[in-house]
Structures are given as structure tokens and as C-alpha cells.
Amino acid sequence: MTKLTDNSIRRELSPNVTVAISMAVYGMAMCGGMLLIGLYHYRDKPSLGQFLLSPSVILCVVAVLGLLVASGVLVRFLCGSQGRKRDRRYAVIMSLLVIVLVGGIGEAALRIAAVEKHNGTFVGNFHLLPIQWREFADRQRTLLALSKAGKPFTVADDTLGWIIGPNRKSEDGLYEISAEGLRSATQGEVLRNGLGDCRVALVGDSFTWGDGVRFEDSWAYRLEQLLPKGCRVLNFGVGGYGIDQMYLRYKRDVTSWKPNLVILSFIDPDLHRTMSSYGFLIVNQNAFPFMKPRFVLDQRGTPNIVNQPLPKAEEIFMLPYIHDVPFIEYDEKYNRTDWDRPQWWYVHRSYFLRFLTSIYPFSEKDRPFVSDADMHAVNSSLLNAFVDAVHKDGATPLLVYLPNKRDFKKRSPWIPEGLQILQNAQLEHVDLTSCLKRDSEPNHFIPKGKPHGGHYTLQANAAVAACLGPIVQDRLGRATAE
């Protein structure tokens, strides 16, 4: 009787064994997911140092060790004597069904919640990678075709990448462009008419252009009101520009105006735009089908453009994968694993697997030509080249650092990259951070979520002009005295 009871006990699968089998199966699934993520982010040809320190390699090693341990536990209990084999197999099958059910629910939920935008798939604010290049390129091509059919506000330029078209007016009526392509009070105004002996030229990005405010509220216009009568401020700013394009804009478009003073004003993100070779990777709010010049330094430290003539947009957007795009490796914002790859097509079909590989996007900043050291060196060289070019043309240069919202969130002793570069290069400059700190921060920037969010408010534009006014007058006075 006792013997029969012992046999029946052995045939029954204890709860602890069931839990152990389930945990082993779940552990194998989790380690399999980790291995997938690690392999997906693995670099093609890493150096030995990159291989040993690579997060993807470390993740793969941990995943393989986890798989071995979980497999060992599973085999031990499956081959054990406790309980019937059928019950042990049943525990495995139920665990697998749970995994499939969770994966299926996750897949369905992600597909329901996902929203397609011009730059990829989003679930809320979460970017579901990879970006499908063909879909992305088709959206860019559509905008390109529409722009060629009409009279677009922003037009392609073979040298600068893009410029504001002359004699334009924005759809919302906020911006009007002169006959020469500069921001002006009225559309088609001829700014060259009636220029006096005092001219101040501005080159910069959308913060210089005055994004989000009327012409009369831009700091360029307000600065003009603070200068002696007859002194004109000419706004050559263009949204999305990097330091490289500002330099080229001066060299090509500003010199013929023979300015007395040339202000190059920039924010920190402009430094990273310098390290891009494609405008469509810089601007992520909407489709932006423009190319961009890319400088690199030669062995003597001289900046040279590597992608002139600029590639044709029509040809770029016909390529099957972004990895085939010429000069893409020179673009800091290009991450190989952010984009679809043919060998991983089965991952791209599943939103759940895409979610797993998007949870922690690994950095690829160690690529040649896009490191932080390269960024500092290229921008420093271009800023020096700008100063030298302005002096050579007989004018006075003025470098101005414009703070953006991040500058007010960081605490001392943090120094923005732009100021680091200016200080290390020993370039004379004006830092307007303390100028804007006199006001309360909410007055500085247009709230995010609103049109032109993150740019200067009219109060901030007024503050910039008020701080620059005396400095500009002083520099103009020095130039006249010389």
C-alpha cells in the first residue's frame, strides 16, 4: 500500500517543478529576445576595442549564457523522474502558449496604437524603429514633386542645400521675402535700393531669421531700430542651417552687399548640423527633401567639401535602401540600425519585434568623421575661416552665441559646446545667455506643441536686440575709426 502511494506521488508534478519549467521557458524566451537585440545592433566590422566594449556584444554574451543556464534547468526537469512526462510536456506547452499569447496581444496592441508619420512609425511619442526607407523616401519625393509644380517657400540650392525663395510669402502670412531672398517687411521689396553707408549683415539659422514672430518683432528689425538712422540690418538667416552653411552663405551671398559688420549667430544644435550631409535627417518635423554640403578636414586641418556637386534629390530617393545613399556615413544623424536592412526583413514585418529592437537604440558615434572631436574641430575651423574671410573683405566679424532652451535647464559648471569651441579657439564672441536670464524663462521660448515651438518669443527677440545694440554700435564705431 505504501509503495503504491509513493508511485502516485512521483507521478504527480509538484507546483515547484511546474514553476521551474515555466521560468526556464520564459527565461529562454527573454534571453532569445536579448540575443535578437544584440545581433540586430551588432556592427559589421568593429575594431577589437569596439568588439570587446560593444554593448551589443556584451548583450549577446549575457543572452547566450542565460540561454545555456535556462536550457540546462529545462532539460534537468524534463528528464527528471518526478511526475509523468506528459505533465512535464504540458507545462512546457502551456508556457509557450503564454509567450505566443503575450506576443500576439502585444503585436495587435502596437498595430492599433501605431501612427505613421513622415519620419516613421510612432506609438505615442515612442519611435518604432526601423524607419522604412522606401516609405520615407516616397514621402520626400511627393513633397519634392509638389514643390516643383508650384512656388515653394524653401527651394533647393546646388551650393547651400536650400535657401528661401526670393519674392515669397509664407502660407500663414507671417514671413515675407524680398526680391533678393532676404526677410523683409513686404513681399518683393528691393532691399538694395536706398542702402546707405552703414550695413550690418546677419547669417544664422531660424533663431536669427526670427521663426515664429512677425518681421517687426524679430531681433534683426529691433536691432536696426537701435542703430544710427540710415543703418540697415540685412537678415540672411535660413532655418535649419549649420555653421557650414552660414559660412558658405556669407561667402556667396553676403559679400556683394559690402557690409560694415557681419554677425554670425548660432545655437548649439547648429554645430551638429554641420556634421550632416542630408537635410532630410536634420529636419524631423516634416518632410524636407534637400541635400546639404558636408565639410571634413584634410591633413593640414583645412575644411573641404566632400560631396560637391551635391547629389540629386530625385536620384537619392530612388535608391532601395538608405545604406546605399552616397556620403551617408558622413552624416552624424545616420544610425545604421535606425533604418530597415534587407537581411532583417522578418523583424521589420513584426511591430512587436520592432518594439524590442527599439527599446534601447545603441549609439554609433564612434564612426569616422562624426565623433565629438571631429565636430569640435570642423566647427572651430569653419568659425576661424569665417572670421578670416570677413576681415579679408574689409569688414568686422562678430560671433554671437544664442542660448536655446536646453542651456537654461543645465546647471553650472556645464558649458554649452558652442561656448567651449569659441573659448578653445580663442575667438572673440558675445554670449547672450546672461542677457536672457534677466527675464523669467517662460518668456524666452514659444511653448512646445505650438507652431514654431522652442524658438524665441517676441520678448526674447527684444532682449537679444537690446543686449546687442550697444555692442554693435561700438563695433561699427571702431570700424569707422579704423
For each feature predicted by the language model, list its residue ranges:
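Histidine-centered active-site loop/cap adjacent to the catalytic His
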Residues: 2-7, 15, 449-482
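Serine-dependent acyl-ester chemistry module
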Residues: 4, 26-49, 94, 268-422, ...
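Internal/C-terminal transmembrane anchor helices
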Residues: 85-111
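N-terminal membrane topogenic signal
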Residues: 9-26
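Conserved SGNH/GDSL esterase-like catalytic core that processes O-acyl groups on lipids
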Residues: 168-169, 176, 183, 201, ...
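Membrane-embedded alpha-helical segments of integral membrane proteins
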Residues: 22-77
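Generic structural signal for small/hydrophobic residues in well-ordered secondary structure
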Residues: 205, 246, 262, 390, ...
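Membrane/wall-proximal cationic-aromatic binding patches
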Residues: 114-226, 334-357, 361-363, 416, ...
